[in-house]
Design a protein with these regions (language model features):
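Non-catalytic accessory segments of hydrolases
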Residues: 2-207, 231
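Active-site loop->helix "elbow" adjoining a glycine-rich segment at hydrolase catalytic centers
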Residues: 156, 208-212, 240-243
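Alpha/beta-hydrolase active-site loop
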Residues: 204-225
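Alpha/beta-hydrolase fold nucleophile elbow
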Residues: 227-239
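Catalytic nucleophile serine of serine hydrolases
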Residues: 238-241, 253, 266
């Protein structure tokens, strides 16, 4: 007499209870393979996103362009946000040339933007945003193993406001469409970055913001290869005040060799102060801070940074009254970072000999018109 189990064995099938166990085992094995594959993919991704810089390890994230106002052409990219390239500019470091970022232990989370430089809001109220610990940069690149050229972007904003994480400057499309590593930086602004206070007496830089930009370019030179960028193929790019900064850096001796091409969009290159103009605005800042006339740079270091920005903000209206001084904020000819007016440097052939693309953006002032109409 043949038992049911013998029939199953003869047919090559398993009895119901054994078939169920085999199916469970098969499912468990498939799940384990999937888990291992996922872990391997995650480990590979973590390795790809974890990068060693001269100050320490950083970990980025994968991001997608989430704008919905038009079709998205940029795919997922690797990003590192808020990487410090300089130390805080608060306290004794205020108004001085920037110092490199101090080292840190462990792996720094670089999934969020760093704070912008202290600045007014677009509403032009008394509200001041940002932090003096602002020397951060952001990196965006497509997922590829190839070494890519680099674009370093300097934001505009009349030397008063702006940041690396303005929505239009986040770099998704430039990185993916042009196959570049995109770097955008924060630097000091307004009375904290674009006002030469040497006439007041005390230790300070004539051009803190320009020095910030040079330090950022040095950081890119020393670190960008670890992010898949080519340090020998760097394009410096900026718009409006950022375009003026590009042209200024083309005439700055310490910036020589830090970039190999330049793009200046709508640059107001004439916005450069002489020593006399800077002296006028330094005294005006002291006056608007309601400080004694003989106040020094050290006295200004003791003041709240938001008050310095607010007082500087009110100086803009004074600048509008003086037709020959179109802004109270601008780089200053200082015989060091900016040895001569950039226009004169270009006329005399003293600029860095790199290819330059320069032009004007149509309707650029329409945004300012919108703000004033509000």
């Amino acid at each position: 007499m043949v038992t049911p189990h013998e029939n199953y064995r003869d047919s090559g099938d398993f009895p119901p209870e054994e078939s169920s166990a085999a199916a469970r085992l098969k499912a468990m094995q498939a799940h384990e393979r999937a888990r291992r594959a996922y872990e391997e993919a995650q480990n590979a991704l973590a390795d790809e996103l974890t990068v060693r810089t001269t100050s320490g390890w950083v970990r980025g994230v994968i991001e997608e362009d989430l704008r919905t106002d038009r079709p998205i052409s940029a795919g997922p990219v690797l990003t590192w946000r808020g990487i410090p390239f300089g130390d805080t500019t608060a306290g004794d470091n205020r108004f001085r040339a920037p110092q490199p970022a101090p080292s840190w232990e462990g792996v720094r989370d670089c999934s969020q933007f760093g704070p912008p430089a202290p600045q007014p809001t677009y509403s032009w109220t008394d509200r001041i945003i940002g932090s003096e610990d602002c020397l951060h940069l952001d990196i965006v690149r497509p997922r590829t193993e190839e070494k890519l050229p680099v674009v370093v972007y300097l934001h505009g904003g009349s030397f008063i406001m702006g940041s690396s994480h303005m929505l239009m400057l986040r770099g998704f499309e430039l990185a993916t469409r042009m196959d570049v590593v995109y770097v955008s930086i924060n630097f000091r602004l307004n009375s904290l970055g674009y006002l030469d206070l040497r006439s007041l007496g005390g230790d300070c830089s004539a051009n803190p913001a320009v020095a910030d930009q040079i330090l950022a370019l040095q950081w890119v030179r020393d670190n960008i290869a670890a992010f898949g960028g080519d340090p020998d193929s760097v394009t410096l790019m900026g718009e409006s005040a950022g375009g003026a900064a590009v042209l200024t850096l083309m005439t700055s001796p310490p910036a020589k060799g830090l970039f190999h091409r330049a793009i200046a969009q709508s640059p107001p290159i004439a916005m450069i102060h002489s020593r006399a103009q800077s002296t006028l605005w330094a005294r005006e800042l002291v006056h608007r801070m309601a400080l004694p006339r003989r106040s020094s740079v050290e006295d200004l270091r003791q003041e709240n940074y938001a008050d310095l920005v607010r007082s500087g903000q009110s100086m803009m209206w004074r600048a509008g009254e003086l037709i020959h001084l179109n802004s109270c904020y601008a780089p200053t000819v200082d015989d060091e970072l900016i040895p001569e007016h950039p226009i004169a440097a270009f006329e005399n052939g003293h600029q860095h000999q790199v290819p330059l693309l320069i032009g004007t953006n149509s309707d650029e002032a329409s945004f300012g018109k919108f703000l004033f109409q509000r």
